Amino acid sequence: MDNDEIFSKVRSIISEQLDKKEDEITIDSRFVEDLNADSLDIYELLYLLEEAFDDKIPENEANEFETVGDVVNFIKKRKG
């Protein structure tokens, strides 16, 4: 799975969960500042991402996610 495929899947999940248009979500979009996600939104997104990619996201790693790109890079590292 390459970065574009991961980004596309992540963007789709974010779009649905946060009720945003996919074209509003970029690799550099910040969850809180740009996408207006609150802590509950982020928690739910993490759950959906874990389900979608069949992987556990450790809390210490998740706390470092500021942008969509951070999530994409994390998943890319884990999926090799």
Swiss-Prot record:
Transmembrane segments: none annotated. One of its GO terms (molecular function) is acyl carrier activity. GO terms for cellular component: cytosol; membrane. It is found in: Cytoplasm. It holds the Pfam family PP-binding. Disulfide bonds: none annotated. The modification O-(pantetheine 4'-phosphoryl)serine is found at residue 39. Pathway: Lipid metabolism; fatty acid biosynthesis. It comes from the Bacteria. Carrier of the growing fatty acid chain in fatty acid biosynthesis. This is Acyl carrier protein. It comes from Borreliella afzelii (strain PKo).
